[in-house]
Amino acid sequence: MAASGQKYYIENRVYYHDTDAGGVVYYASYLKHLEEGRTEFMRSRGIDVAEYAKGGTLFPVVHLEIDYKTPARYGDTIRVYTKPEKIGNASLEFSQEIRRGEDTILKARTVWACVNVAPGGSAAKTLLKPIRVPQEIRQRIGA
């Protein structure tokens, strides 16, 4: 089922701790920005992922693809765009872009699984069971 809606974005600054010895953003640092984009997208739709976690429903990233186009640098202001693409039975797929002005820094596709901590288990023990994406999330994302 395709999710409708426009791309949502947050604006972030690139800090020194994001960069590597070459003065550009270290590739793994982008993961933090992508996560913040997805989390804030959900929050903008009235969905608090942390509240779901308290009830035992988690949304781990199970797939991530990134195409790097051009580097961001210390001091840059970047926008992290997030758009829901598909809601499966037990998964959510997002397309994301990080841009600096008109320049595309990267394009990404991320898949979250929707899982519940099994009775007596914990996330640390990885006793996780796939569950259907809650109806509230389906409605608020627009699918």
Where are these regions (language model features)?
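Hot-dog-fold acyl-thioester-processing enzymes
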Residues: 2-61, 117-143
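HotDog/MaoC-like acyl-thioester-processing domains
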Residues: 8-10, 73-77, 85-143
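Hydrophobic beta-strand-centered segment that forms part of the acyl-chain substrate-binding groove
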Residues: 41-92, 107, 112-113
